[in-house]
């Protein structure tokens, strides 16, 4: 067990859950979804299999929790995004903050690795691809579309907000994400990252303003 992961003052249950998620994330990346078992997760995290099941009732649930945890580490979960959107910042400022975190998440080596794992396994196991999509991309789109809808203040339909969320993510990914997955593109850093996100924000702002009733 990685002793460096332990922190003072954490409830034992929370600490064990964190250790399980950490071990599971590593195993899913190293072994793939199909070759990772709850037994191996228990062994890697230093807890019993019963303890693993007390936190996650199935491997599917554990896998999705690992994906959601990664998104949360970049403040792209509902709680963090709601905090940004309700802090009084403008639409463009909110989209800029979300966009920069989104790009940083996509460029994270573990994120790239899990995308590659999913692509490799999807042909023989569409189930794991669906689990990943639900916990990661789809969940993020739902949160983002709700933020966009709220900024519309009743002047935009939810269906339009949903499409704008899809459009914004597409603008952020551009060709950069595909090239990153192929290993032929270096991460965007500093001014280059800010410029890339700013361009996407300018475009989605135009679409947003055009969509207002």
What function would you assign to each model-found segment?
Residues 1-4, 142, 146-149, 153, ...:
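C-terminal peripheral helix-coil segments that are non-catalytic and often amphipathic
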């Amino acid at each position: 067990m990685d002793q460096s992961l332990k922190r003072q003052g954490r409830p034992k249950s929370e600490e064990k859950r964190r250790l399980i998620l950490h071990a599971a994330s590593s195993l899913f990346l190293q072994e793939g979804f199909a070759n990772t078992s709850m037994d191996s997760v228990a062994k890697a995290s230093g807890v019993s299999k019963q303890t693993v099941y007390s936190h996650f009732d199935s491997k599917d649930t554990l896998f999705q929790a690992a994906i959601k945890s990664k998104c949360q580490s970049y403040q792209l979960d509902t709680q963090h995004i709601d905090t940004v959107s309700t802090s009084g910042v403008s639409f463009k400022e909110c989209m800029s903050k979300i966009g920069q975190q989104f790009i940083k998440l996509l460029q994270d080596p573990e994120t790239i690795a899990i995308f590659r794992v999913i692509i490799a396994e999807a042909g023989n196991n569409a189930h794991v691809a669906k689990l990943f999509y639900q916990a990661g991309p789809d969940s993020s789109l739902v949160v983002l579309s709700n933020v966009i809808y709220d900024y519309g203040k009743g002047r935009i339909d939810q269906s339009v907000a949903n499409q704008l969320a899809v459009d914004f993510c597409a603008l952020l990914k551009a060709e950069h994400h595909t090239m990153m997955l192929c290993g032929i593109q270096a991460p965007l850093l500093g001014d280059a990252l800010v410029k890339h996100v700013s361009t996407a924000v300018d475009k989605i702002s135009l679409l947003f303003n055009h969509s207002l009733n």
